[in-house]
């Protein structure tokens, strides 16, 4: 069994390396990279570990999932992928167990709320369960690879010629969305710089290289400029269970200004960012970084007298959002609960 031991050791090292990277903040990895890497590790866990039935496998996935999410609670994509895999295990077990897909669907809100109490032991053994689960995970990985392209393909439905579009900070999804629209439409993009991180400058450079007329402005000018804007298009870190956003700091200000001027606010986000979390879960919601960009350490006299916090994310309530554009189409914030019931099982909301 030396081969199996070596494989197990290599997998443990990969998981440990991933957990350490999460603790350090994930570096420059995008949410899509995180999702893909999480799925890859879970697939290896399923193939390399020994388990005899779906119940044991789900407990194994939950244990590793808790370990990954505890390393960086604010990186909700990791937990979302763990829940997607748990849902896949339940569905594949149900098919082999002889339960039809229709009976497993939650076609009403009442059933969605009560289904958490219906438990199944998942103790029956099926030889082909592993291969079916791996195949479903591979399909999910293929789906992940096309998420940005699927969102960008909808750009021409929402962006029209000579419009003024506002965005904030840097988002790969929004950049792809605007680039796709620019292939056939001419429009002007205003980018709020998103201080103190100033990621908006990177966004503006990329859009300018694509031939899009782009202007960078300070966050303080958002309200003054909003009256000229036709649409606000933003990305987000997480879509919460109530249809709200956990987005980069400054987004709430932007959303309030858009609401005041009745400017549509569109959120471009793939489905893997949809999380069953609610905004009252403070440990996983808040993330603070060193406030050096706000108040440099050279300001010694002031530093002795003040305590400075630098939050990374804003909470944006659902009533400020007009439309979500995901890889499966456009939806209103009120429809999020339905999408969530299709992605995650109620028993898996808490790992």
From Swiss-Prot:
Official protein name in the record: Translation initiation factor eIF2B subunit beta
Organism this protein belongs to: Bos taurus (Bovine)
Record GO terms (molecular function): ATP binding; GTP binding; guanyl-nucleotide exchange factor activity; translation initiation factor activity
Subunit structure: Component of the translation initiation factor 2B (eIF2B) complex which is a heterodecamer of two sets of five different subunits: alpha, beta, gamma, delta and epsilon. Subunits alpha, beta and delta comprise a regulatory subcomplex and subunits epsilon and gamma comprise a catalytic subcomplex. Within the complex, the hexameric regulatory complex resides at the center, with the two heterodimeric catalytic subcomplexes bound on opposite sides.
Protein biosynthesis as UniProt keyword: yes
Keywords: Cytoplasm, Initiation factor, Protein biosynthesis
Family: Belongs to the eIF-2B alpha/beta/delta subunits family.
GO biological processes: central nervous system development; cytoplasmic translational initiation; myelination; oligodendrocyte development; ovarian follicle development; T cell receptor signaling pathway; translational initiation
Protein's job: Acts as a component of the translation initiation factor 2B (eIF2B) complex, which catalyzes the exchange of GDP for GTP on eukaryotic initiation factor 2 (eIF2) gamma subunit. Its guanine nucleotide exchange factor activity is repressed when bound to eIF2 complex phosphorylated on the alpha subunit, thereby limiting the amount of methionyl-initiator methionine tRNA available to the ribosome and consequently global translation is repressed.
């Amino acid at each position: 069994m030396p081969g199996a031991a070596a494989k197990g050791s290599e997998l443990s090292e990969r998981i440990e390396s991933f957990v350490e990277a999460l603790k350090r903040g994930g570096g420059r990895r995008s949410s899509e990279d995180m999702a893909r890497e999480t799925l890859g590790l879970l697939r290896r866990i399923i193939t390399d570990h020994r388990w005899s039935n779906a119940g044991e496998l789900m407990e194994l996935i939950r244990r590793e999932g808790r370990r990954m999410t505890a390393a960086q609670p604010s990186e909700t994509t990791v937990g979302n992928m763990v829940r997607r895999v748990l849902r896949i295990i339940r569905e594949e077990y149900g098919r082999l167990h002889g339960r039809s897909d229709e009976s497993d669907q939650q076609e009403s809100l009442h059933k969605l709320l009560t289904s958490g109490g219906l438990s199944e032991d998942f103790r029956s053994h099926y030889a082909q369960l592993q291969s079916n689960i791996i195949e479903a995970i591979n399909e999910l990985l293929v789906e992940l690879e096309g998420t940005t392209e699927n969102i960008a393909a909808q750009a021409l439905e929402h962006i029209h010629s000579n419009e003024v579009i506002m965005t904030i900070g840097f988002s790969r999804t929004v950049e792809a969305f605007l680039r796709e629209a620019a292939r056939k439409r001419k429009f002007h993009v205003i980018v709020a710089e998103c201080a103190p991180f100033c990621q908006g400058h990177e966004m503006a450079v990329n859009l300018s290289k694509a031939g899009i007329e782009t202007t960078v402005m300070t966050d303080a000018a958002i309200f003054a400029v909003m009256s000229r804007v036709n649409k606000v298009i933003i990305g987000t870190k997480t879509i919460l269970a109530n249809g709200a956003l956990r987005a980069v700091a400054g987004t709430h200000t932007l959303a309030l200004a858009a609401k005041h001027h009745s400017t549509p606010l569109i959120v471009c986000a793939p489905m893997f960012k949809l999380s069953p979390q609610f905004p009252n879960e403070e440990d996983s919601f808040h993330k603070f970084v060193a406030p050096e960009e706000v108040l440099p350490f050279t300001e010694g006299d002031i530093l002795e007298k003040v305590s400075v916090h630098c939050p990374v994310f804003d909470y944006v309530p659902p009533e400020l959002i007009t439309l979500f554009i995901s890889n499966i189409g456009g939806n209103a914030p009120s429809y999020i609960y339905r999408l969530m019931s299709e992605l995650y099982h109620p028993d898996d909301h808490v790992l």
